[in-house]
Each structure stands twice: as C-alpha cells, then as structure tokens.
C-alpha cells in the first residue's frame, strides 16, 4: 500500500468513528429530551377515555436520577393514586392477642402536663395508628381538673395523637366533642363530633379538616355515638348514633357518610332492644358492630350494616358467657342469640367482640360487678350456638385487683389479611379513688397474633399517693 492509500484509509476510518460518536451523542440527547417531556404519559388514559373532573390525590412525586456516560437523565416515577379502602381481605386467623402499646398517661401526669381524658379509642389510616380521647379542657395538675367525673361539658374536645404518644400540651384538638367517632376512608379522616345541650346537641361531620355537614338531636335526649372507630368501605363511612333514654327505649339510627356528607340515614331494625356505644369492624362487603344494651340485656347486641342497600339487621351475641358489666356469674348467665337476656341489664360498659366462623373472640371485665380487671378468650360456637359456654385461649390483660373501663375494637389491614386489635381504658381517680378530685385514664392496646404468647398484667400502674390532688 503506497503512502497515498494509507492516508486515505486512515482518514476514512477516522471519519467513520467520528460519525458514529456524533450519532451516539444525538441519540443520548434525544433520549434525555424525550424522557424529560413525557412525564404526562404516566398512567395516561386510552384515547377517547373520559377523565374525571374531581382532583386526584397524589401520595408522592419522586424523581429518580440515572447516570449514563456523564449524562444525567431525569426519570419521573409515575405517582401513586390514593384509593378508598374496601377491606376485602379475609380476617386473620389468630391464636390470641399480643401486647402492642401502652401510653402511661396517669403515671406521666405525676410530673408533667398531660390532659385529663376519658372515652379513648384507637383507629388507623393506611400507614399509621392514632389514639383518640375526649379531653376535659384541662391538664391533670390543674385546679380545673376538679370534678372531671362529668361526661358532658362544653370544654371537652376530641384529642388525636400518634399511638403511644400521651396527650401532652401540644396535642391537636380535632373538634369540640363530648361524644365522638373517627375513621379514615383511605383518602382522609372523618370525625363525628357531638357537643351542646343534652336536650339539643349537634353532631358535626368533619372531613379532611373541614366541616362538611351536621345534624341536630332527633329525640332531645343526649345524642351520642360510638366512642370508637367508625368504618369506611369504598368511600362510604357508617356510624351508629343513638338519641333517647339510657335506661329505656331510645332511637338508634345508622348514618352513611361520603367525604363528610350524610347521604343516607337508616333506622335500627331487628331484635336489638337498646343499642349504645357500638364497637364496629369491617366484614366485607358490610360492617358489623357489637354494642351495649343499657336497658334489658347483659348480653351484647349485634348490628349488621349492609353498605350497598343501607339495610340494617340486629340481634344478640349467642355466647352464654356474656360480655357486659354488671352481669350474672357464668353458671347462670344466658343468651339465645335473638333477645336481651333480662339479666342485670341496666347500666353497662362499652365493650367488643368479633366473629371467627362459628366461634367468637371477646373481651370483658374480670369482675362481674365492677369495672375491674380485663380478660379475653375464645368461645367455641359463641357466634352461632345459643348459650354456648366452652371457653379456650383465655388471657388476662389487667388483673382483677386493678381498674379497667371501656374497651373497643379497631382493625388493621396487613398484606394478606385484616387483623383485629383492641384497647382497654384504664380509669383512675373519682369515683372510686377519693383521695383525688379528678377522673382520667390511660390505655393499653393488644393485637391479634398467630404466634405464641406469654402471660402478664398491664394495669395503669400509677401510685395514687404520688398524684396531684
């Protein structure tokens, strides 16, 4: 090859390499521009598809940086659309309950500014669990805490903190309320808050931090609600409310709410004679509630809510080991599934239970007469067999020498099933402990487990002699 041919060959190869490099740079530039300007194509609808007019809630918007040959490419990850909860997964199969949370509010009140509360409960959004309670408008070490044994005053407010965080001075006051219920529909919180005169109270419906609707007393006799979480399925939330006598016939209605707006009201139907303070849980496609009969029965009423056609049915828990306090001893207590047992039916306490096939998981005070101690167990046939009394898997939550109080259920959705959890109110102060002038509580929380577990007792634990008077 002569010198001229060598020069031509080298030039051709160099030109080819330069051309390839140039084309590669153009390709990289085109890719960068295309990725940057095609963000709108994330989850883009098919052609001619009608898009909804309402806004779509975006949970997060993350930019991922990819480095390629010293060239930065920004790739927009498609945002996640927040959806309504439907609770369609099966209920978790459990062997019992394991400790989950305890806030120690009364013990902490001995040396800190902690709210005076009662009627606590727990509810969860899709990410976190929160504890709620009705505050008395005062901290414990405060003269305003005197005589806080009373249920209904205009200063009571609904408090909300992350579960396990006591109600300190920085706690958010969600609304004015001496009776309440809260639940999260998957997009935002709904709070049902009742306050006002005993004979003409108002229930406010607050959704996503805004007052959306309200309803006044319909029987002019202490309008009241669950004191535990409501339940939302596919954007419709339901809450049980009662107005009328606490020891005679009352008017119970089941309200259906969508994004804070009342869309339907159904009267109570079925055989339940008196219904208060229901503990409700999702039982897809409906909702089931275990309530308090403060008139005729120490066996607990059951309210079944059809979320599709708004129909209601009611009955009583079949278990002959009844759940209310006061009650007969277990040898003489009864329940026939349909009617109140007329056994020490007046008075009572908020409680919970839930069905497990034909069986029943339930909790109750250990004392049959007082709000003392707390136990859980499973009743074989307790959901389907009248007067069933075969008990297994008993656990002591609070020993019988210590005070308890209200209790209620809340549900937590896992990857494959829905777990049932419960809380126990641990009341301290008046009326039983007369050294002090206040009445308040702490809580302990347990959740269902498929594992093994040990034993113990988890009372409030405050030494009343250390407490402010």
From Swiss-Prot:
Q: Which cellular components does GO assign to this protein?
A: host cell plasma membrane; membrane; virion membrane
Q: What positions does the record give for glycosylation?
A: 61, 69-70, 86, 146, 200, 234, 402
**Known activity regulation?**
Inhibited by the neuraminidase inhibitors zanamivir (Relenza) and oseltamivir (Tamiflu). These drugs interfere with the release of progeny virus from infected cells and are effective against all influenza strains. Resistance to neuraminidase inhibitors is quite rare.
Can you provide one Gene Ontology molecular function annotated for this UniProt record? exo-alpha-sialidase activity
**What's the cofactor?**
Ca(2+)
Name the segments for region: Involved in apical transport and lipid raft association. 11-33
Query: Biased composition, Low complexity: where in the chain?
Result: 333-342
- Cross-referenced CDD domains: Influenza_NA
Q: Which residues bind Ca(2+)?
A: 293, 297, 324, 345-347
| TM region(s), chain numbering | 10-30
Provide the catalytic activity annotation. Hydrolysis of alpha-(2->3)-, alpha-(2->6)-, alpha-(2->8)- glycosidic linkages of terminal sialic acid residues in oligosaccharides, glycoproteins, glycolipids, colominic acid and synthetic substrates
Q: Where is this region: Disordered?
A: 324-349
The protein's matches in InterPro entries, at most eight in alphabetical order, are given as:
Glyco_hydro_34, Sialidase_Influenza_A/B, Sialidase_sf
The free-text cofactor remark is: Binds 1 Ca(2+) ion per subunit.
Which segments carry the region annotation Head of neuraminidase?
A: 91-469
Record note on modification: N-glycosylated.
Q: Which Pfam families match?
A: Neur
List locations, semicolon-separated: Virion membrane; Host apical cell membrane
- Tagged with keyword Membrane: yes
UniProt free text on domains = Intact N-terminus is essential for virion morphogenesis. Possesses two apical sorting signals, one in the ectodomain, which is likely to be a glycan, and the other in the transmembrane domain. The transmembrane domain also plays a role in lipid raft association.
Other remarks on record? The influenza A genome consist of 8 RNA segments. Genetic variation of hemagglutinin and/or neuraminidase genes results in the emergence of new influenza strains. The mechanism of variation can be the result of point mutations or the result of genetic reassortment between segments of two different strains.
The entry describes its oligomerization and partners as: Homotetramer.
What this protein is called in its record is Neuraminidase
């Amino acid at each position: 090859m002569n010198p001229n041919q060598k020069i031509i060959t080298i030039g051709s190869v160099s030109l080819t390499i330069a051309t390839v490099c140039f084309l590669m740079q153009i390709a990289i530039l085109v890719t960068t521009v295309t990725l940057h300007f095609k963000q709108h194509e994330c989850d883009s609808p098919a052609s001619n598809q009608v898009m909804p007019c309402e806004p779509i809630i975006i949970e997060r918007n993350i930019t991922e940086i990819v480095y390629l040959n010293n060239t930065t490419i920004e790739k927009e990850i498609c945002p996640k659309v927040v959806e309504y909860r439907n609770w369609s997964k099966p209920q978790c199969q459990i062997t019992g309950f394991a400790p989950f949370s305890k806030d120690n509010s009364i013990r902490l009140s001995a040396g800190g500014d902690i709210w005076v509360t009662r009627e606590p409960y727990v509810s969860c959004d899709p990410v976190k669990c929160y504890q709620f309670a009705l505050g008395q408008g005062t901290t414990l070490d405060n003269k305003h805490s005197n005589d806080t044994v009373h249920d209904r005053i205009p200063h009571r407010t609904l408090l909300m903190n992350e579960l396990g965080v006591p109600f300190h001075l920085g706690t958010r006051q969600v609304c004015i309320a001496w009776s309440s219920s809260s639940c999260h529909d998957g997009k935002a919180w709904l709070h049902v808050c009742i306050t006002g005169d005993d004979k003409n109270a108002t229930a406010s419906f607050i959704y996503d931090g805004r007052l959306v609707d309200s309803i006044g007393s319909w029987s002019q006799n202490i309008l009241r609600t669950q004191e535990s979480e409501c339940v939302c399925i596919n954007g419709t939330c339901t809450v049980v409310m009662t107005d009328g006598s606490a020891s005679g016939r009352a008017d119970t209605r089941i309200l259906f709410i969508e994004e804070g707006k009342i869309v339907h009201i159904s009267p109570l139907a079925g055989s339940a004679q008196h219904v208060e303070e229901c503990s409700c849980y999702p039982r897809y496609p409906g909702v089931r509630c275990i309530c308090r009969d403060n008139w005729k029965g120490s066996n607990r009423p059951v309210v079944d809510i059809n979320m599709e056609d708004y129909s209601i049915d009611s009955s009583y828990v079949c278990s002959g080991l009844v759940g209310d306090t006061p009650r007969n001893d277990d040898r003489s207590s009864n329940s026939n599934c349909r009617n109140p047992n007329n056994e020490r039916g007046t008075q009572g306490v908020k409680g919970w239970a839930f069905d497990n096939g034909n069986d029943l998981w339930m909790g109750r005070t250990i004392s049959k007469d007082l709000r003392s101690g707390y136990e859980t167990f499973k009743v074989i046939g307790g959901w389907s067999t009248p007067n069933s009394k075969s008990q297994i898997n008993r656990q002591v939550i609070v020993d019988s020498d210590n005070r308890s109080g209200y209790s209620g259920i809340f549900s937590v959705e896992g990857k494959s099933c829905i777990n049932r959890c419960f809380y126990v109110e641990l009341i301290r102060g008046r009326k039983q402990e007369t050294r002090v002038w206040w009445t308040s509580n702490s809580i302990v929380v347990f959740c269902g487990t498929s594992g093994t577990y040990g034993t113990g007792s988890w009372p409030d634990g405050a030494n009343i002699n250390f407490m402010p008077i």
